């Protein structure tokens, strides 16, 4: 199999809010849209945001959503500060293996900033 492009499909309940979050807050470039889904560039892959998911007012626990959307950045603290200015609550944590900045999207899906490998 020769992979042409990879993608992630994110089923959402708060569809419009999630589009705004990923497009405007995280600056993922717009690719295309239909009434039921929106596709944004996700580095060399794509993030397809679709209707039909279930939201949570708090961060979903792992058995509700065992996936984390990871955004590798040059500097976690700087990226976290940029998101905070836009109103995104980011918790920066340091581990022996690196630094992350954890936050959630409008549906309660966990996302993380990560320093380079």
Residue ranges and their predicted role:
Residues 1, 81-117:
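Vicinal oxygen chelate
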Residues 1-19, 67-69:
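N-terminal beta-strand motif that seeds the catalytic metal site of vicinal oxygen chelate
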Residues 14-28, 85:
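Amphipathic alpha-helical segments
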Residues 21, 39-41, 82:
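Alpha-helical scaffold elements within enzyme catalytic domains, especially in hydrolases
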Residues 27-33, 88-92:
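Short secondary-structure junctions
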Residues 29-64, 110-116:
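Conserved short beta-strand elements that form part of the metal-binding/catalytic scaffold
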Residues 38, 67, 99-101:
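Short beta-strand micro-motifs in enzyme catalytic cores
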Residues 67-80, 87:
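Mid-chain, well-packed structural core segment of small domains
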């Amino acid at each position: 199999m020769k992979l042409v492009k990879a993608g992630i499909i994110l089923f959402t309940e708060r569809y419009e809010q999630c589009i705004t979050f990923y497009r405007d807050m995280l600056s993922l470039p717009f690719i295309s849209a239909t009434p039921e889904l929106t596709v944004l560039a996700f580095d060399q892959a794509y993030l397809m945001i679709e209707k039909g998911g279930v939201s949570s007012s708090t961060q979903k626990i792992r058995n509700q959503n065992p996936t984390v959307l990871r955004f590798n950045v040059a500097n976690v603290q700087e990226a976290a500060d940029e998101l905070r200015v836009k109103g995104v609550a980011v918790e920066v944590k340091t581990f022996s293996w690196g630094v992350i900045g954890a936050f959630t999207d409008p549906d309660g899906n966990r996302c993380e900033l990560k320093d380079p490998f």
